[in-house]
Amino acid sequence: MKAASVAVRAGWSRGLIELRQSFTNGGDVLSHLLWPVLMLTVLFFLRDTAFGTSGLLLGTLALPSILGMNAAMGMVSMSQALTAEREDGTLLRAKATPNGMPGYLIGKVVSVAGGLLADLAILLIPGIFVVGGLAIGGPGSWATLTWVLLLGMVATLPIGAVLGSVFTSARSQGLIQLPVLGMIAISGIFYPITAMPDWLQWVAQAFPIYWLGLGMRSALLPDGAAAIEIAASWRHWETAGVLGAWAVLGLLVAPVVLRRMARRESGSSVAARRERALRRVG
């Protein structure tokens, strides 16, 4: 019990330090701002475009969907961070210290989740003024936003940790981008999913990105907007069920995969990866 509390305190402290560093480093600050600015630009041009005869504007529909997409992208951020720090030896150093691996993973969750929340705030706050038609006045909206976001992070961050243990180099991380972009394209983020073929709708509903987008739309859009969703409903129970299933899967698989990855780490494996990276640069 004492070892666990030490790991939690060390991980929390490590995560806060990493988070503070990410907002004091010019390159990291730019990366935090770049994506929200790009999305706000897209929303600006969509703000007056209507979806069919529904009377709803694409900009209004897209803002909560993009928030859900960004929450799901925490999975990619976690995967990239683990892969990069595995390659540069950070993971090996954590393994060599008492309670190092649990503390390292807790710290990584804190820093990635904290950065994700900051990015969502950077997008949501100005987005409210860019697009109209949002229903954010009541406490119910913010309560739904909170549980969808928290459950979504629990569902996606462990999967990101699993993916980070699979790839052996930062360069190979590029392999994950194409399927993720494909999932975004079919998950109703920038255009309602009901406009897509039925078989694509079924594929999208198997993954967290669609459900995070749906949950965010249910929190921020008026009730009438559910008319353009599948079954003309926000389907809160289904959202909780699918995200919960992904969370259980990730929490069961991630510790096993990460322990196996940590056992394989050694000074020679880190040196070999560095040598391969230098050969690519040369």
Model regions: which residues?
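Short hydrophobic, aromatic-rich alpha-helical segments embedded in or entering the lipid bilayer
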Residues: 2, 6-14, 191-228, 237
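Transmembrane helix segments
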Residues: 42-50, 164-210
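Residues that define the loop-to-transmembrane-helix transition and helix capping
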Residues: 26-27, 60, 102, 170-171, ...
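Transmembrane helix-boundary elements of multi-pass transport/secretion proteins
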Residues: 3-4, 10, 17-88, 114-116, ...
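Helix-loop-helix units of permease transmembrane domains in multi-pass membrane transporters
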Residues: 81-113
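Alpha-helical transmembrane segments and their short interhelical loops
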Residues: 101, 106-177, 236-240, 244, ...
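Transmembrane alpha-helix boundary and packing residues in multipass membrane permease domains
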Residues: 41-45, 124, 128, 161, ...
